[in-house]
Amino acid sequence: MKKKFLSAVLAVLTTATLLAGCGGSSDGQASSGDTGSKGDKMKVGMVTDAGTIDDKSFNQGTWEGIQKAEKDLGVEAKYLKPSGTTEADYLKEIGNLYDAGFKFIVTPGFKFETAIYKGQEKYKDAKFVLLDGAPHSGAKDAKPEVGPNTVSIFFAEEQAGFMAGVATA
């Protein structure tokens, strides 16, 4: 009985947290996606890693989130797939997005850590989101250096594992 009660409480708390985190603005109005400077649409770009945009993993999940922002917030979205998987390949596509006016760039995965480390310095007026990684120089024992124009997001996989364990108990 305790396990069922605990599972129910955790499910309610998880649902409430998700709904609160995904809720709209407090005034009930949707954002238009404008940058506010010239009425231009915000341009959100993504660089894929070695996978494809429909890989049922980080690339697909990231792109679907950007597409939702495009639909709900009116942002302009674009993704580029590098020709290779080196830091230089990633930096080239980051530069291509930047040159096309995409100053909000999302990269899915730790493979982008060194490219974002360099990109955040080179493109100081751009904003970067690095999923499941932290920018660093690539040197041995390098410490993460998240610039003021970068957000590094790590998923709390241990929480999902805990919830799965509770659910099966």
Positions of the model-derived regions?
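Flexible loop/hinge segments that line or gate small-molecule binding clefts
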Residues: E121-F154
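Extracytoplasmic "Venus flytrap"
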Residues: V44-A69, K78-L91, G109-F112
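Short, well-structured alpha-helical segments in soluble
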Residues: E87-F102
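Divalent cation-coordinating acidic motifs and surrounding scaffolds
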Residues: D34, K81, I94-Y98
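Hydrophobic alpha-helical segments within soluble ligand-binding/sensing domains
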Residues: I153-A169
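Bacterial lipoprotein signal-peptidase II cleavage site
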Residues: L18-G39
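Periplasmic-binding protein-like
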Residues: G101-G109, K127-L131
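Sec-dependent N-terminal signal peptides of Gram-positive bacterial secreted proteins and lipoproteins
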Residues: K2-S25
